Amino acid sequence: MADLLTVTGLTIVRGGRVLVQDLSLSLTRGAVTALTGPNGSGKSTTAWCLSLHDRDCTGEIAFEGVSAADMSPRSVRALHRRTIALQPQHLLLEDSWSVARNLRHAAWSLALPWRRRSDLVSEVMARTAVEDLARRRVDSLSGGERMRVALARTRLMREPGLVVLDEPTAGGDEGLSALVTGMLDEWVGSAAGVLVVTHDQRLVERAEHVIRLGDEPAA
């Protein structure tokens, strides 16, 4: 199967500090790749770059054979609406809004058909077990509940080609871990490629491929 995303010589520098140097990798459809390593090794920043949200990195990134350097801003926005689903570390949630309003807004931002938005929001809320939280403000939720809402937001994209998750089991319990594992299986089953930034050994063991940043020794 052809590579979904290829990276050659990725280097990331922030504040004069080299976070990632000369990283090369490839992501394929129908597989989970775990990105792990110690805190401060650049995992989250790497995920942000690979999802094409951060262009302030050097090296070559190509999505389905097209260089990111050759993509127009409009093309990148289209990928973010229809093809690249991202759950970043800061979760992309508006704290002062209710859970339902956050998800409705996310459905609108993905340019989903108006008539389908309500049904789709209800569907993903049920899938991620946040129906009972619909009217609660995000800033009243626990860490695990917030993560479930963030996963629901990510799940709104119906047929992503690439899914990028940053610490999706952080602050959660066994139920959240089981939810994430099930969602990984669903995405892989629909031929999406998944990149998951994680310290969770269960997700590392679930992955077909593991990339370690920093000085963490290989298992």
Where is each model-derived feature located?
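The feature captures the beta-strand-to-loop junction immediately N-terminal to the Walker
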Residues: T36-P38
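Helix-to-loop junction immediately C-terminal to a conserved catalytic motif
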Residues: S51
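ABC ATPase NBD coupling module
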Residues: A68-I84
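Q-loop/switch helix immediately C-terminal to the Walker
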Residues: H90, D95-S109
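Conserved ABC ATPase "signature" region
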Residues: R104, R116-L133
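Conserved ABC ATPase signature
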Residues: R137-L141, E145
